[in-house]
Amino acid sequence: MGSFSIWHWLIVLVIVMLVFGTKKLRNIGQDLGGAVKGFKDGMKDADAAADASTQQKISGGQTLEGEAREKVEKTHS
């Protein structure tokens, strides 16, 4: 039973092309490509907005109060 070989996938592809036709498959491919492009553009816009928000917070002149600690490396002699 194992995995499908390349011949199985080619037969499935031919059957799908016969059932739906190449024009319908082309339209589905274009719609899917447009959706992926829209998603990527949306993610890019969200990242740009997050970066701008972070830069605005940093340049706001805020000071963080805290305690600095030295990192001491211990060596075994």
From Swiss-Prot:
Membrane-topology annotation of the record: Single-pass membrane protein
Basic and acidic residues: compositionally biased ranges: 66-77
Segments for region (Disordered): 50-77
Compositional bias per record (Polar residues), positions renumbered to this chain: 53-62
InterPro entries the record matches: TatA/B/E (IPR003369), TatA/E (IPR006312)
Principal subcellular localization: membrane
Gene Ontology biological process terms, A to Z: protein transport by the Tat complex
Ranges that cross the membrane: 1-21
SUBUNIT field: The Tat system comprises two distinct complexes: a TatABC complex, containing multiple copies of TatA, TatB and TatC subunits, and a separate TatA complex, containing only TatA subunits. Substrates initially bind to the TatABC complex, which probably triggers association of the separate TatA complex to form the active translocon.
HAMAP family: TatA_E (MF_00236)
Protein name according to UniProt: Sec-independent protein translocase protein TatA
